Amino acid sequence: MFGLGKLRFRGPDKQKIDDEAHVADYQAAEAIGRAKLGKLAFYYRDLGKKYYVPYDYIERAFCRISECQPDDSPAYYYYRLILVHDGREFANLIFNKEEEVDSILEKLKTLSPDIQIG
């Protein structure tokens, strides 16, 4: 069953944590789409699991726009938030609205000025 029991997060190293500081930070974090921005870390869900990424781990963040062209229909776009560490993309979060990705990028820059945006 999903959602039952204690909140647990996986870090960039895929190790699980469940300390009270991160649980409280997650619950108080600002939600934008499928992501949350807390004071301690950036949180997101992927395939039913919750992940946390400390802001100092993120070297670069940017938006990638993907186009989908169905047969005999107009094209539609979806937006991806890409997070990079050590030259490798480690998170690829899909959003339907560009405004959500733009808002996250703005707030990431405010929370951690060392993150390269774009």
Residue ranges and their predicted role:
Residues A21, Y26, L37, F42-R45, ...:
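Generic preference for well-ordered secondary structure
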Residues I32-G33, L40, Y51, L81:
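Residue-level detector of beta-strand structural context in well-folded domains
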Residues A31, R45-K49, D86:
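Short strand-coil-strand connectors
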